[in-house]
Amino acid sequence: MTVTDPIADMLVRIKNASMRRHPTVDVPYSKMKEKILEILLREGYIARYEVIGEIPQKYIRVYLKYKGKTPVIQDVKRVSKPGRRYYVNKEEIPRVLGGLGIAILSTSKGIMTDKEARLLGVGGELICMVW
């Protein structure tokens, strides 16, 4: 099956698996997905992830994180989509839930969080928001 938005597919898989309290979820591999998962790991939204297999069956196993029985990821929102890209400059970068969540941006300096983009003074494509 062809997926038109692989990033949204990954985010929804993670959200659905965490709402059903699954310990892991598998997503097809891409470098961009791995960079986004790196940020989610660094910010404490997932426990860990590992890349499994060889191309073309390469995939990423994401180990989800919970506080008691409550999932750490409450919700995710895909902002920029293949049919409607959404770009922000450094002044327009949103604060997610007053700083309790994160926004992930693709900038000229790589994929990073909203806080890192503000510190570097760069804008870019607003990929998603996680809280």
From Swiss-Prot:
Signal sequence, renumbered to the chain: none
Record InterPro entries: Ribosomal_uS8, Ribosomal_uS8_CS, Ribosomal_uS8_sf
Q: Which UniProt keywords apply?
A: Ribonucleoprotein, Ribosomal protein, RNA-binding, rRNA-binding
Query: Do the record's keywords include rRNA-binding?
Result: yes
Q: Name one GO biological process term.
A: translation
Short name of any one Pfam family annotated for the protein:
Ribosomal_S8
Entry annotated with the keyword Ribosomal protein: yes
As one GO molecular function, the record gives: rRNA binding
Q: Which PANTHER family match?
A: 40S RIBOSOMAL PROTEIN S15A
Q: What does this protein do?
A: One of the primary rRNA binding proteins, it binds directly to 16S rRNA central domain where it helps coordinate assembly of the platform of the 30S subunit.
| Assembly, per entry | Part of the 30S ribosomal subunit. Contacts proteins S5 and S12.
Q: Which family does it belong to?
A: Belongs to the universal ribosomal protein uS8 family.
Q: What is this protein called?
A: Small ribosomal subunit protein uS8
